[in-house]
Amino acid sequence: MANSLLVTAQAGGQKLFNFLKRSLHAENNEIHRWIRTGQVRINKKRAKAFDIVHENDEIRIPPFAPNRADTLPKKTVKEFPFPVIYENEHVLIIDKPRGIACQGGTGQKENIADILKEYYSAANFVPAPAHRLDKETQGILLIGKTYQSLRFLTECMKSDENSLRQAVRHEAKKIYRAWVYGDIADFARNTPFLCHYLYHNEEKQKEEVFFVRHAANRKETEDIISKYGTKPMQKAQIALASLKCLEVKNGKSLVEIGIYTGRKHQIRVQLASSGFPLVGDTKYAPKTLLRKKDEFFLQACKITLPPNDFTEQCVFGI
């Protein structure tokens, strides 16, 4: 006799294949085969992998399909091991510690995504990070607890290459803090906007600068975008950020960086290229600056969302 799953409000709106992938302990090819052979049905009707499931839909599955809720140990979010900044029925926002990856990968034994799967094992929809922070970056991480909120948050965290000119007229929606080598006060005062075109060096396995055009104000930044555009050139992509010096102490500076684009290692590369690498950054800082006692610090400290139906507030900070 076939089993069935009921689509909850949290899980509605996603594709059938994604719903089954999140609900069952099964390989992708198994799920596709069950759908293709009619062993999976939506409200007693044959379905396709990319059909959208809705709240209260009944999804028939084979009797031998292992339900994730039955095969994983049940835990509650009360045991969640990270500081919670904000939470409601749609969204969970945590303070991610340094040293843990957001997603699994080579050599990543522990990551946020797998921890969410474990702690929400009984849920019909497993919450997931809406964006990524590097393993060594700490701070605000947005997590969608429903399919709809996850999709909304993911879209919010994307940079819109077509509207960068409008974006730089306002504060960036993602703000970071970092300690850098050197006294950056004068540089930050004269160059509050950093504009680099970055590319990935396969041989060195790091991001490098194709060329630089810094700006003294928002109008100059808009002019740079208008002149050079946002489309990749020679495989290099635009990386745009604002810069402010908060404190200078013992030959190091605490800075605030607002990013308008989301390039890999963007903050680390832009500051290193400007002559002020992050303290303890073994990948981009010159070895002559590095000291054993230096501790890497890069923190996502503020995120601004547009008005929405999923959160009661729009600005989140630590």
What annotation goes with each model-predicted range?
Residues 2-318:
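RNA pseudouridine synthases
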